[in-house]
């Protein structure tokens, strides 16, 4: 994903920002995007980044946390959603792509009832706070009204 999006922004005025708490993941991102420009890398928590006031985001790819145990990841995902809505950081008509929503691990390992797994709290919250559901499959796409 990082390489593909990195290639897509080449020759544009689009800034591509990748954030991860794990420095090894950021180093891997740097390796796979070597030679590309318009990319910023930040080793920090998603919550710190989202609350930093870095301006408006047109496209946000959320790939938060682990699939097991699911509850801490779902709670983090909700906190991220609260920051997204509360700080008004998504531009009008901006898009959020949430990955791994329908991953079956939480149902199998944690006996999770929700079909939304790690996004079981964040999706309902975002839908009540200015976002529309555009696609509801393995990945979920939301768009700001």
How should these model regions be labeled?
Residues 1-48:
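SAM cofactor-binding core of SAM-dependent methyltransferases
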Residues 18, 61, 97-98:
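Generic enzyme active-site microenvironment
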Residues 52-59:
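A short acidic, Gly/Pro-enriched loop at the edge of an enzyme's catalytic core
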Residues 59-65:
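Conserved proline-anchored active-site loop of SAM-dependent methyltransferases
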Residues 66-145:
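C-terminal substrate-binding/active-site "lid" region of AdoMet-derived donor-dependent transferases
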């Amino acid at each position: 994903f990082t390489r593909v999006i990195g290639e897509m922004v080449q020759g544009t005025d689009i800034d591509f920002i990748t954030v991860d708490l794990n420095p090894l993941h950021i180093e891997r991102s740097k390796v796979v995007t070597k030679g590309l420009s318009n990319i910023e890398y930040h080793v920090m928590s998603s919550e710190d980044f989202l609350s930093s006031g870095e301006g408006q985001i047109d496209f946000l790819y959320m790939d938060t946390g682990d699939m097991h145990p699911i509850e801490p990841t779902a709670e983090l995902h909700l906190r991220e959603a609260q920051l997204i809505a509360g700080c008004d950081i998504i531009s009008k008509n901006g898009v959020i792509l949430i990955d791994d929503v329908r991953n079956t691990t939480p149902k199998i390992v944690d006996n999770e009832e929700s079909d939304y797994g790690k996004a079981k709290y964040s999706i309902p919250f975002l839908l009540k706070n200015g976002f529309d559901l555009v696609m509801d499959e393995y990945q979920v796409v939301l768009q700001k009204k």
